[in-house]
Curated annotation (Swiss-Prot):
Family, as annotated: Belongs to the glycosyl hydrolase 23 family.
Presence of the UniProt keyword Disulfide bond in the record: yes
Protein name per its UniProtKB record: Lysozyme g-like protein 2
GO CC annotation, single: extracellular region
MF terms (GO), sorted A to Z: lysozyme activity
PANTHER family xref list: LYSOZYME G FAMILY MEMBER, LYSOZYME G-LIKE PROTEIN 2
Compartments, record wording: Secreted
Top-level lineage group: Eukaryota
Annotated gene: Lyg2
Length: 213
């Protein structure tokens, strides 16, 4: 009788310990599960977005559906960079899905680049740093270069927080995305945020969040 009691006691103890460990890992280290990790700049899954802009010449491939369609088209090209994107995202405390979304919009996962450059020779790398605004380092799809690009993005978001402390988290993130592309001086009021850019990026980011980024 005693051995049986001891056996079931050990089973209960192991089960309890395992459950506590799983809970503590997920609650203390959000990096474990991609859907729980959103970094230091807000949860993109809660942010409103309208997707890619619609106009008279683009009524079929616009809105959230259009953004998700383009994100899915780029998924195969971006998947090989998933581990790198996650590592860089966690290094800079920003959602990897947001990085993937920018890469999708700017370079389609590098598929349209020529030796890392756009067709005009003005923008470089997966996130397409403008050589007139920045000084790109490293090879176009290297960890070194992606760290630089994401570092610039997060600095722009932090600058928005300092410049506009009364803005909400979503506005500061969207302002940072706009400033990454256009420069800090272009943002004076929330109306200066590039809605076409940020709505498309956020819709793509939500897609990538649901696909393991």
């Amino acid at each position: 009788m005693v051995p049986s009691v001891v056996f079931w006691g050990l089973i209960a103890l192991v089960g309890t310990a395992k459950g506590s460990y799983t809970h503590s890992v997920h609650s203390m280290n959000p990096h474990v599960h991609p859907r729980l990790y959103h970094g230091c700049y807000g949860d993109i899954m809660t942010m409103e977005t309208f997707g890619a802009p619609c106009d008279i010449n683009n009524l079929m491939n616009c809105g959230i559906h259009g953004s998700e369609m383009f994100a899915e088209m780029d998924l195969k090209a971006i998947k090989p960079y998933r581990i790198l994107i996650k590592e860089v995202g966690q290094r800079h405390c920003i959602d990897p899905a947001l990085i993937a979304a920018i890469i999708s919009r700017e370079s389609h996962g590098g598929a349209v680049l020529q030796n890392g450059w756009d067709h005009k020779g003005q923008r470089f790398g997966l996130m397409q740093l403008d050589k007139n605004m920045y000084h790109p380092i490293g090879s176009w799809d290297s960890k070194e270069h992606l760290l630089q690009s994401v570092g610039i993005l997060t600095e722009r978001i932090k600058a928005m927080k300092r410049k506009f402390p009364t803005w909400n988290t979503a506005q500061q993130l969207k302002g940072g995305l706009t400033a990454f592309k256009s420069g800090m001086e272009t943002i004076v009021t929330p109306a200066d945020i590039d809605g076409d850019l940020v709505d498309d990026v956020l819709a793509r980011a939500k897609f990538y969040k649901r696909h393991g980024f």
